[in-house]
Amino acid sequence: MAAAKGTAIGIDLGTTYSCVGVFQHGKVEIIANDQGNRTTPSYVAFTDTERLIGDAAKNQVAMNPQNTVFDAKRLIGRKFNDPVVQSDMKLWPFQVINEGGKPKVMVSYKGEKKAFYPEEISSMVLTKMKETAEAFLGYTVTNAVITVPAYFNDSQRQATKDAGVIAGLNVLRIINEPTAAAIAYGLDKAGQGERHVLIFDLGGGTFDVSVLTIDDGIFEVKATAGDTHLGGEDFDNRLVSHFVEEFKRKHKKDISQNKRAVRRLRTACERAKRTLSSSTQANLEIDSLYEGIDFYTSITRARFEELCADLFRGTLEPVEKALRDAKMDKAKIHDIVLVGGSTRIPKVQRLLQDYFNGRDLNKSINPDEAVAYGAAVQAAILMGDKSEKVQDLLLLDVAPLSLGLETAGGVMTVLIKRNSTIPTKQTQIFTTYSDNQPGVLIQVYEGERAMTRDNNLLGRFDLTGIPPAPRGVPQIEVTFDIDANGILNVTAMDKSTGKANKITITNDKGRLSKEEIERMVLDAEKYKAEDEVQREKIAAKNALESYAFNMKSAVSDEGLQGKISESDKKKILSKCNEVLLWLEANQLAEKDEFDHKRKELEQVCNPIITKLYQGGCTGPSCGTGYTPGRAATGPTIEEVD
């Protein structure tokens, strides 16, 4: 595939589902994957023979829960001992281990134990999205804009960028999901004077509320709030707990420790939840859920709303907080935009509508696709797309948390306030605390609390070589500079000597080293090559099987009676049966073996078939009846739990 210089894609890398779009011919195309779905599960599965990504991974999760990884976004850029990681680990069927303070996912792949960083798992999902786009466009794509929740701190943003690099992408920019949704929305509503927009994004795993103003193509994020751990999965969990209790009541058995039963129940619950957005009742039918017991039951929308009542009501708190931070009254909001699949839930819409005194909600954009839509537009802008639709757009993002440094007594001195528009640069003069102090320790924090001990330390460095002087005399100029990706550079300079030191905040030790990233890039290519070998192997196997079946049906065709001698017919049938028996016994053979068997079979069949043709074949099996490599006549799909 040739690479096209001018195309960049937008990827919404979600906790549970991901989506990819491209801006071309003046409009955004959201691209369907090989299964025809416009969103792809953010799942990666490892088996004894292969690696699966997306739908294929999610579909086999009930059979292989320990080796099917999802929710990598909850791990990315976090430390192993982060309370979020520790509490999530209790809910995951896969194993998370601690390697040097960082979490890694441990799975069994091709019979060996393997540990992957969250960045690697996310990179596999990104690779899948990249390939989805390439299949649609017909050429290689490397440039991309990737979105993250507005809440992501610096190390989570860096780690997401690393995942893009491992996937072979040139990450043009990391942008906030609500900002991306606003772009999608702003494109549709250009030229209406200043508008205040509230974006309510309730996805599979995260919840974000953002307040922005859009004025003549300029977007400004005024405030963001939310809950990094609220979404569709939590509603699924409530349903699962409800049905586990119901199963206990009805059958006096506890299924909660049986991972496969719980996973099958969860799949049915997710389906029921979706059904309840359009119907008032949903039925669950799960055959042989546990110890041979069939579980047939139903749930009403009202009961579902009751089970999740506190979670649904809780979505309004971040709405109030975002409005407070933006210093905006709710009556001043022009548009309320719904993003994320969970905003389809009628109760959530009703609560939001009531809070805004019955105002209409904007549902014009497909909530699952809005973020990828905006990312695709932003990608086109960064690639210099000159079409009128995108030319007038300017994007102003914000810093999600206040940034500052520690001064005497452990006080947090803020240089960049939370919700400041980025990119931004702030400079302040500091001085020494004691006489003849030879150096200062610059400690950089993010957070909203008055004391640094309650905030998050991002990094520290020393500025040494300050000439002896009384306290308060030296002038140390400290500059905080955040670039468009939200990456922070802090510089300190002694004005008397011009001596300076700086740090790029890539969260302490939280980031992968250049070597690690390079190793992961190579690993990713290796896994991709292995996947390719596996695909070719399956294709060769299928081609052999279908050729054998086609030959069998061709020579047994009524229309060939009298055209083919019994001995020839027998010869073909016995060779076909021999090959099919060999196939059954050698499912895991190599591609060459399948190809070799097919040649063997062709050597027997071709002379006979050629003879038939020359004899002027007329039966219905003539022509296409025995084209080698036609699809196998056996079943090609399998039921999913």
From Swiss-Prot:
Residues 396-511 are annotated as: Substrate-binding domain (SBD). This is Heat shock 70 kDa protein 1-like. ATP binds at residues 14-17, 73, 204-206, 270-277, 341-344. PANTHER family: HEAT SHOCK PROTEIN 70KDA (PTHR19375). The keyword Chaperone applies. The lineage of its organism: Eukaryota, Metazoa, Chordata, Craniata, Vertebrata. GO terms for molecular function: ATP binding; ATP hydrolysis activity; ATP-dependent protein folding chaperone; heat shock protein binding; protein folding chaperone; ubiquitin protein ligase binding; unfolded protein binding. Belongs to the heat shock protein 70 family. Keywords: ATP-binding, Chaperone, Nucleotide-binding, Stress response. Interacts with PRKN. Molecular chaperone implicated in a wide variety of cellular processes, including protection of the proteome from stress, folding and transport of newly synthesized polypeptides, activation of proteolysis of misfolded proteins and the formation and dissociation of protein complexes. Plays a pivotal role in the protein quality control system, ensuring the correct folding of proteins, the re-folding of misfolded proteins and controlling the targeting of proteins for subsequent degradation. This is achieved through cycles of ATP binding, ATP hydrolysis and ADP release, mediated by co-chaperones. The gene is HSPA1L.
